[in-house]
């Protein structure tokens, strides 16, 4: 089920013309989350929702996921919990690579987060992000 934003009716008031429908576009910034009851606009924004947004007539060929504090691990070492978000998003990217969801490569690149105030442990976190994101994370 596709979740609608709290301002869905407002967003639907105007259609914007697609100016260059053949122009390949990479969406450089989006987030994915679920069950975020504190979110002001939309408590859920996952693959179904982003596909609905990007399949609007533009030629969105890929997207870049930016960390947003979602899907962190609840257990294990505190400094490694953010790696859960990379693992989750890498799964979304793998779904898109299958081709079942269309041609757009959602989360073709992932920007994760590391608390750099943890000193030498930051290197371990970066290594774990690289392992979890396979080829999608670059340092």
Model-flagged regions — what are they?
Residues 132-135:
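Acidic, His- and aromatic-enriched active-site or binding-groove loops in soluble protein domains
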Residues 138-139:
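Conserved small/polar residues in nucleotide/adenosyl-binding loops
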Residues 64-67, 108-114:
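Extended hydrophobic secondary-structure segments that form protein cores and membrane-embedded regions
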């Amino acid at each position: 089920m596709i979740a609608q934003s709290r301002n869905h009716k407002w967003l639907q008031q105007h259609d914007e013309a697609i100016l260059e429908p053949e122009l390949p576009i990479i969406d450089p910034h989006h987030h994915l989350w679920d069950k975020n009851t504190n979110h002001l606009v939309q408590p859920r924004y996952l693959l179904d929702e982003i596909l609905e947004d990007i399949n609007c007539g533009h030629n969105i060929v890929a997207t870049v996921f930016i960390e947003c504090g979602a899907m962190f691990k609840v257990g294990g070492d505190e400094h490694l919990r953010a790696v859960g978000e990379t693992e989750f998003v890498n799964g979304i990217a793998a779904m898109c690579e299958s081709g079942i969801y269309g041609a757009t490569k959602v989360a073709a690149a992932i920007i994760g987060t590391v608390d750099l105030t943890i000193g030498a442990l930051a290197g371990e976190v970066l290594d774990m992000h690289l392992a979890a994101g396979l080829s999608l994370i670059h340092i």
